[in-house]
Amino acid sequence: MIKRRKTREITLGTLKIGGNNPIVVQSMTSTKTHDIEATISQIDRLIKAGCEAIRVAVPAKEDAEALKEIVKYSEVPIIADIHFVPYMAFLSMEAGAHGIRINPGNINKKEIVRDIVLEAKKRNICVRLGVNSGSLEKHLLEKYGYPSAEALAESALNWSEFFESLGFYNFKVSIKGSDVIQNALANEIFAEKTDTPLHIGITEAGMGTQGIVKSSVGLGILLYKGIGDTIRVSLTDEPEKEVEVAYEILKSLGLKKKGIDIVSCPTCGRIEVNLPNVVKQVQEALKDKDLSIKVAIMGCAVNAIGEASHADVGLACMKGGALLFKNGKILKKVTEENMVSELLETIEKYYQEV
């Protein structure tokens, strides 16, 4: 079992982060925030996918003004993403945002950062303090020669100390880079020196297989070491996909349970059925079910039940049908035409029993 890093508890709206609380899955809308209808529609889809906190871009006044309606509507906390125009932070807080994300490295004056922090403190609004290689302070670049892991961690520690010197502790830190190893090292250095909660992710991970693999490895390294209080999988894809992948990463490490865990074999020359099609049918039928159960779908009967003994229910396929099993014991043989429906019925019964 993974022992998570002990961090202080902070509050984002009604959501508790850090401490002994579960890891929070976040994502970000890809709509123009001032398009309230489109933004709310995407928020609905994200919530349905299991997203627990949602960030929206606020580059202009019309976006900040739209937050009033969006915050009122959303069932989960809304975080305003602020870059380069610090005035938007004040407008977003006034509009009711539960949290704001700022990157002090792209705010010209420390006094402005101070004013934002003091306003957040007054309103009890959570702040995400962002540090990345593209906005590292000049003196740190001169000291280290490039945006090294040490430079990123030092920047985050310096700004954290500044926030705390103002008596403000309701913040988390994100240290992000597109390089997996640098990203991991920077977060590890920071985590060793403070109890501030960490938001983790790999920025600019990419799309498709590349993005998923990069995020899975980068997040997996940190999560295995107990680091991470909130996470986002950044993909060039629909935001709902980010949430899906985030849950799969957490489930694979035993850090979160959501939905059914379907395992299937990679197939070989012994296969007698269209296994990918069977798996897709089962996934589609169960995608909206909030059940905590492991299902195995194996391509043949050779060692299938033994290999999948850890599963609660499953199929060991063979020519013309499959063996349906539960808790490692064969229940019956089913035909190829009925094996998916029989499996789904068994899953439903299993869930009622537990």
From Swiss-Prot:
One GO process term, biological-process aspect: terpenoid biosynthetic process
Cofactor dependency: [4Fe-4S] cluster
Top-level taxon of the source organism: Bacteria
InterPro entries per UniProt: Dihydropteroate_synth-like_sf, IspG_bac, IspG_bac-typ, NO2/SO3_Rdtase_4Fe4S_sf
Known EC number: 1.17.7.3
Alphabetical keyword list: 4Fe-4S, Iron, Iron-sulfur, Isoprene biosynthesis, Metal-binding, Oxidoreductase
Pathway membership: Isoprenoid biosynthesis; isopentenyl diphosphate biosynthesis via DXP pathway; isopentenyl diphosphate from 1-deoxy-D-xylulose 5-phosphate: step 5/6
Binding site for [4Fe-4S] cluster: 265, 268, 300, 307
Entry's Gene Ontology molecular function annotations: 4 iron, 4 sulfur cluster binding; 4-hydroxy-3-methylbut-2-en-1-yl diphosphate synthase activity (ferredoxin); 4-hydroxy-3-methylbut-2-enyl-diphosphate synthase activity (flavodoxin); iron ion binding
Cofactor binding note from Swiss-Prot or TrEMBL: Binds 1 [4Fe-4S] cluster.
EC top class, as a word: oxidoreductase
Pfam family, one: GcpE
HAMAP family named in the record: IspG
Similarity remark: Belongs to the IspG family.
Function comment: Converts 2C-methyl-D-erythritol 2,4-cyclodiphosphate (ME-2,4cPP) into 1-hydroxy-2-methyl-2-(E)-butenyl 4-diphosphate.
Name of protein: 4-hydroxy-3-methylbut-2-en-1-yl diphosphate synthase (flavodoxin)
Organism listed in the record: Hydrogenobaculum sp. (strain Y04AAS1)
Lineage: Bacteria, Pseudomonadati, Aquificota, Aquificia, Aquificales
